[in-house]
Amino acid sequence: MKKIGKALRETAFTLGVCFIAVGAFASSSVYAQTIIEDWDKVTRPAPPELKSVTVDIRSTALLVLDFNGAQDPKKGPCNTEIKPRCLTSVPKVQTMLSEARAKGVFIVYSLAGIGTPADIATAIAPHANDPIVKSGPDKFVGTDLEKILADKGIKTVIVTGTSSEGAVLDTATDAALKGMNVVVPVDGMSSTDLYAEQYVAWHLTHAPGVSAKVTLTKIQMIKF
């Protein structure tokens, strides 16, 4: 009987410890917060530093991504109905594009959706020999962009376009992870809203494996 009593007491003690542990876990789970619950507690980070950059024209390509839709909103995202900030960025991109062409920089375009080359904003329209790829947000996926750049000995890409959280972020990230140097002018990328542009600027300068290869800048701070 003594052995049975001792065994019962030990069992009861073990069960008690288990109940306490389960209770503590359940209690902590109730109070555990995810980013969704803590959304309003987030402190906005300081803006990333913009840096001047000089690129080697022989090994640099300018990517002009998804600027189609300017003439017909049904033909792409760069229009007054969906992304008016994209149209606002066109004059600055045009300035950089003109200088890049004059210096012999390799230019590559992309298209989104059902757009055709004729749907790209007229001010920055491609020339006859400019390569044009067409795919989803990451312009390396489902295209020969990597080969196009490799065949030209490209080591640095300047990424412009819309949307910032789509074509710019995904293509810039992929390029960085492939070992390329990536230059992103903040006044050459655009989105539907400011938050997306802010997030992309933060992500590109903080993401592990990416930030070390990315230079965030402005168009006027890029020297060819």
Segments from the language model and where they lie:
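Short, glycine-rich nucleotide/cofactor-binding loops
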Residues: 68, 80-89, 160-165
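Active-site-adjacent betaalpha module
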Residues: 31-61, 103, 114-224
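Bacterial N-terminal signal peptides that target proteins for export
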Residues: 2-17
